[in-house]
Amino acid sequence: VQFLSTAQLLLTTLVVKLAIIAVLSTMLVRFQQFRRILLTEQRAWRERLVFAFMLGIPLVGGVAARLLLNYNAADFLLAGPFLAGLLAGPYAGAIVGTLLGSPALIGGEVGAMPFAVGCGFAGGGIREVCPKEAIWHLSPLFFTDLHRHAWQVVSRFKVDWLLLLAAAPVGLELIRQGVGLRFGTNAIFFYQPDSLLMAALIALSTVLSVAIPIKIWNTARIEHRLQEQDTLLMEARVDALANQINPHFLFNTLTSISSLIRSQPETARTLILKLSTMLRRMLRTQEHF
């Protein structure tokens, strides 16, 4: 007995798909090494490989789940390589595309690997021409300002990177739909909409599959930068306080010690020991900050 219609089942699959990518992105950003890679835009080859495999290996499980269990919600054959290329360069995107396309190719989908690798190179190509910070501005709520960005393109004849970042996954999804309709599901897996509304929702879910991880990871980047700023601010405050207090404090203390050396040598010795202990403690505190 089928409790859901075809459209309802497809809509549920798309919602679960977005939940899966959100959970996976949150789990990955908890790893210190993965977070450290996100903080730098100029990455070495080793960091790109680590990023590609840390993102690609869990996504391979999603493709395998679709092939073995017929569970379509965990398939990110398009969004995964595109996201890797967008954040780590074309070769990282191609590596993720190869990882995700391999089980699909083994399962008989001959067009899966070329398409996935192409998505990786597409994301990497956009990264090469797009300002790096513009990538991090892509948000799951991009469509709320879409009309304003479209008007800027029309009125100023200037490239709007948000529109490009949102349009690229839509274009790739249309290519996948076209290839799937032409050659069938034996060539490549694709969601089959029964109306224009469902086709639009499929395209929207593809963009959100890219935008949600970027939003989650950008939040982690901002939190790390705020922590660094708080640490630097605390260091500056400690240094300013030490520079303000130490000269007067030392002058008064040394004056008192000099007057006690002849009359009360034991008291002067005690003051010197306390002063040295206090200065050592202040030095350790500054080194700690």
Give residue spans per PLM region:
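Hydrophobic transmembrane alpha-helices
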Residues: Q2-F82, A92-G93, G97-D194
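A short glycine-centered flexible hinge/capping loop motif at secondary-structure junctions
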Residues: A88-G89
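Non-cytosolic membrane-interface motifs at loop->transmembrane helix junctions
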Residues: A74-G80, A187-L197
